[in-house]
Amino acid sequence: MAPLSGEWLEALKGEFRKPYYRTLFQKVGEEYQTRKIFPPADDIFNAFHFTPLSQVKVVILGQDPYHNDGQAHGLCFSVKKDVEIPPSLVNIYQELHDDLGCRIPSHGNLTKWAKQGVLLLNTVLTVRAHQANSHRGIGWEEFTDAAIQVLNTQDRPIVFILWGRPAQLKKRMLNNPKHLILEAPHPSPLSAYRGFFGSKPFSQTNQFLEANGLTPIDWQIDEL
């Protein structure tokens, strides 16, 4: 696993010393040696690598990584550029188009968002190939909860975008009045028509950032 560095390492270093993390590290290491696991080990912490703590303006919470070949690269909802765009991201792009008029790109790589301060964080950071939720309950939730708690304590406005019930369960940790919490159903085809479409998270986020003197996010994903 490519280790955390910089601000996130400083903020979360206490977690690495806890028994749950030592158990998690050993379990994940064994899984990578004996099974096909996604994302590639060096990409596990990409959400933290691409978006340093001091630069976080927006947090989008996902669940666990995509579990088919070549998809996951450590950013929730994002896929590598030559991979078919997954259905949930198709719906995110449709809402982005309806909300802000952004062109719908031909790829699903959201690195541009991450580099502008959008932390694309799954609550579980690894998964077995073709087995959704297979690494739930082995310790990742405790680790990512610690990251969410660090974000909650930041003394500056941050937007938390919570899509679907698992993400919305994290709301109990978000009690800092400086932050904005946006909730909607998950963009999955199973639930997008229950209120995800029309929720306008992207324009609401930018309005909040601008109202607080921060540069808005350029949500347009460019062709690569």
Model-derived segments and their meaning:
Residues A2-P3, G14-L162, P166-L169, L174, ...:
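A polyanion-binding, active-site-adjacent surface
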Residues S5-L9:
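Short, contiguous pre-domain boundary segments
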Residues E223:
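Ligand-binding clefts/hinges and TM-proximal coupling segments of bilobed small-molecule sensing domains
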Residues S199-K200:
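Polytopic transmembrane helical bundles with strong interfacial aromatic enrichment
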Residues F196:
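C-terminal substrate-binding/active-site "lid" region of AdoMet-derived donor-dependent transferases
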